[in-house]
A protein has these predicted regions:
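Alpha-helical interface subdomain recognition
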Residues: 5-153
C-alpha cells in the first residue's frame, strides 16, 4: 500500500516534469517561428508551422488539466488512484516527447544542435516515457484497472 502510493506520487511528479518540457519546447518553437523568416515572411505564417504550434499548445493544456486534476484527487494517506497516476504519466510523457519533436521540426537543423536546447528536451522527454514505468506497463495497468472497475467519469 505504501509502495503503491509512492509510485502514484512518482508518476504524478514525472507527469509534471513533462509539462515543463512541453512548455519550454512551445516557447522555443513559438519564438523561433516569429523570428525566423522564409520567403520574406516569418515562419509563423506557414500552415504546417501553425499546426505544430497549435497542436502542441492544445496537447500541453490538456496535459496540464489532467496533471492538476490527478494532483487534486490524490490521497496522500492511502493508495487508490492507480488508473489516473498511470494515465497522467502515460499521456504527459508522450505529449512532451511529441511537442519536443515538433519543436525540432519547426527549428529544422537548429533543432538538432544544442544551441536551442530542444534536442535535449526531446531526450529528457524520452527518458520520462521510460522512468516510472514504460508506456507498455502503463497500458497493462490501466487496462487491468478499467476492466475491474469500468469507471469512466
Amino acid at each position: 500500500k505504501h509502495m503503491m502510493r509512492n509510485l502514484e506520487l512518482e508518476r504524478l511528479t514525472l507527469a509534471a516534469m513533462s509539462l515543463g518540457i512541453a512548455r519550454r519546447s512551445i516557447e522555443i518553437m513559438n519564438r523561433y517561428a516569429n523570428e525566423r523568416h522564409a520567403f520574406g515572411k516569418p515562419l509563423r505564417h506557414f500552415g504546417q508551422i501553425q499546426r505544430h504550434i497549435a497542436e502542441s499548445y492544445a496537447e500541453y493544456m490538456a496535459g496540464k488539466a489532467y496533471v492538476y486534476s490527478t494532483a487534486a484527487n490524490l490521497k496522500l494517506d492511502s493508495s487508490g488512484n492507480r488508473l489516473d497516476s498511470d494515465g497522467v504519466k502515460l499521456y504527459a510523457a508522450t505529449m512532451a516527447k511529441n511537442v519536443a519533436d515538433r519543436a525540432i521540426q519547426v527549428l529544422g537543423g537548429y533543432g538538432y544542435v544544442g544551441e536551442y536546447t530542444v534536442e535535449r528536451l526531446w531526450r529528457d522527454a524520452k527518458l520520462l516515457e521510460i522512468g516510472g514505468g514504460t508506456n507498455e506497463a502503463h497500458h497493462k495497468n490501466m487496462t487491468r484497472e478499467l476492466s475491474s472497475t469500468l469507471k469512466l467519469d
